[in-house]
Swiss-Prot record, chain A:
Annotated family: Belongs to the Wnt family.
Leader peptide range in chain numbering: 1-37
Changes after translation: Palmitoleoylation is required for efficient binding to frizzled receptors. Depalmitoleoylation leads to Wnt signaling pathway inhibition.
Species annotation: Caenorhabditis elegans
Sample GO molecular function, one term: cytokine activity
GO terms (BP aspect): anterior/posterior axis specification; anterior/posterior axon guidance; canonical Wnt signaling pathway; cell fate commitment; cell fate specification involved in pattern specification; embryo development ending in birth or egg hatching; interneuron migration; motor neuron migration
Effect of a null allele: Anterior displacement of the nerve ring in L1 stage mutant animals. Defective ALM, BDU, CAN and QR neuroblast migration and irregular CP and CAN axon growth and guidance. Double knockout with cfz-2 results in enhanced CAN migration defects, but the same QR neuroblast migration defects as the single cfz-2 knockout alone. Double knockout with cwn-1 results in ALM, CAN and HSN migration defects. Triple knockout with cwn-1 and cfz-2 results in enhanced neuronal cell migratory defects.
Record protein name field: Protein Wnt-2
Gene3D superfamilies: 3.30.2460.20
Compartmental location: Secreted, Extracellular space, Extracellular matrix
Domain of life: Eukaryota
Swiss-Prot record, chain B:
Organism from which the protein derives: Caenorhabditis elegans
Top-rank lineage group of the source organism: Eukaryota
Protein name as catalogued: Protein-serine O-palmitoleoyltransferase porcupine
Family designation: Belongs to the membrane-bound acyltransferase family. Porcupine subfamily.
Subcellular location(s) of the protein: Membrane
Amino acid sequence: MIPRRSCWLILLLNLLNVQSLLDASWWSTVAQLSTALAGHNVKPVCELPGLSPGQAQVCELFKDHMPAVSIGAQNAIQECQRQFTGHRWNCSTHYSTGMLGPIHKMATREAAFTYAILSAGVTHEIGRRCKQGLLTSCGCSDETKPKNVPTDWSWGGCGDNVEYGYKFSRDFIDIREKEHDPKRNHDNGRSLMNRRNNEAGRKILKRHRKPKCKCHGVSGACNMKTCWMQLPSMEQVGKILRNKYDKAIRVQINDRGNLQLLADEATKERKTRALPTDLVFMDDSPDYCRFDRHSGTLGTEGRVCKRGSGGAEGCDSLCCGRGYNTYTQEVKSKCNCKFEWCCKVVCQTCNNVTQVDICK
Amino acid sequence: MDNGHGYEEFELLEDGSLGECSTQVANATFLTISKLICLVVAFKFIKHIPISTTVRVYVHVFASTFTVMWFSRNHLQSAIIYNMFSLISLALAIKQFSGYIILAGNISLLIALQNFCRHYRSEDYFLSIRGILMIHIMRLTTVAFNLEKANSNKFRFVQFSSYVEYIYFPPFIIFGPYLSFEQFFKMRDKKWTGSENELGFIIQSLLAIFNAITLAIISSCHFEFFEPSSQFMEDALTAMSFRFSHYFVCLSTQAFVLMLGSDVVVANPLNIEFSRSTLQTVSEWNKPFHTFLHENIFKRRLFNSTACNVFFTFAVSSLLHGLDFQMTITLLALGFIAYSETVFRKRLSARYSMCVAAKACPVRSNSLSCKHRHSNKTGRALIINLFFLMLSMYHLVFTGMTFTDDYSAIGYPFDHAWKIWGSHYYSSFMISFLFLALSKII
């Protein structure tokens, strides 16, 4: 537990760095769109500070899409946290800023995973709502393209709903990486990496569509099948991306300004070409043990761990050798419920004492 | 500097653009039904063309063989298997073997084929051809029982050709329906009744086909229209999906028999969805199937005991599916549920003189109501019948929710049904045991 006096210092320091935090936490803005929608009971607010000018423009043009983007982002964050439960980096929110979603200042594997799964989440949700007919510009719209929409943008037509979600996600998310935002530095490498990982997330969703079939026939036989393509669930996407995360590829920027593979130091094997669905990163990951303002890590202090477990959630690993404190926790629950004639159920209140191990 | 310029573009591996579920299912079902409609139209004209009996027999045999090949994945294999069943059964029938022996032989052959497919990891192939073989065995058994009555001295080629034509009738091979011998020849010998009547039949058929395809779309794509909010709703949708797939088959075949000039009823979905009792559900599920079991198995009374004959009927019904534990246990469950409900309602009807039996009361010609004191119109009987209507709907969910999509093409595991029924705490069985107990008390 951080002493109370440090909270003010941290808050003050965070205010000084709010400019750089905004860049890394724009997903938090996207995830808040539905909150703004619910709170004000009006159309989503497109002036949130985390959106880039291009994204704000798309937001105005496709206001009915923004709740889907928001829910897709939230689903992705949930799945991310589920995949990394018990790990030092667990996709958690920076508690002092009150923002939603992880923050990545460095171009690490974790940043790659986060961008990929968020992109996949938005694609998934847009595609799903397309199918349900909840988005106006999905399906066979005869509306002509407005003039202020750039010419190379995809305009919703009669395409497959997954295709539409894919294109919208690409346009809305990647536009940020292509803009010259005065708020941020011109980090070409990071921008290319983000675009690459965004694309990987979207491609994984498209490639893992599977046909689902139903049998028809005499008395439960299967004389005939009717089949249709089905999207993978976010759980499946999370699992696939987790695999990609474990096998992420290190890249750097070459002289021509392109991403270039680095030799894998472990195997000394040089990959000639990365798959389109591979995740890429440029920086080594920190150990995520200590709170570090510069690298944007939260640390594992105060995390619940499992004593005696050898996995990532074990106290030895999660607490980084600092040890843990054991606390007793009283949980009240109803027990020994009996039916009394007539006519009610009477329960006793039991106090269950459990032990919780928390990292020092 | 343009940041996008340096981005290395990877080639998009575009999957083929796919329509949505409803579009794909509509296209697939219409394509299959179109092929069958071609057969129906062709044989509607063939039956009116004056050709010799010998030529007609050959036309039927070859067309049927090609139909089996056309609709199966393994063409030659399916044709050989189909004709093997025919040749063995006809040979045994001509040699005056009993219909029961031929039925048992066919079922043994079916189970042997199933084990063969299982051995070579081709269970999906067996399931794809099982429906065809089931109806085939039913027709062969019907011929066998008919031949039992025939006098061997008067057996002629004309009679034999009738049997062959009955067995090898291409429009009814894939989805059925099963027609009894009398029904088939009544249909075949029906004269051309004029363009007006034929147009009426065609319109009825097209309406049935439209309904069939609609139900197939709902069966496959119900998730597009409705997302379940609870586990019970999901189970109900699974059961509905299974039933609507069945209705698709029944209404399609209903259209075929209408086009060919028969008035045989295959199934009425409304009578099943809003059934008076589970007994009615069981008999209405597939009327031709019910006719076969009732006339060829139950009414022949192989055993003296009615209970034994009922059990034997269910056993045959189950074994016509091969060794399918899921189907066996579902049929037994339906039999048990229907039996207990019938017993209870019969007792209830007699004890309180109410018109609440499993079967509707027969209305006598000399009065407007039945013999019971509380007829259908009284409030008390109406409420009780409404309760049993709702219960029948629940039984439909209970017995149908085990037919999930994940194993339907390869066969269900042994404990699949029990696990799913366990999630409902075996409620239909509990209700049935309760009914049996109550019928002893009141």
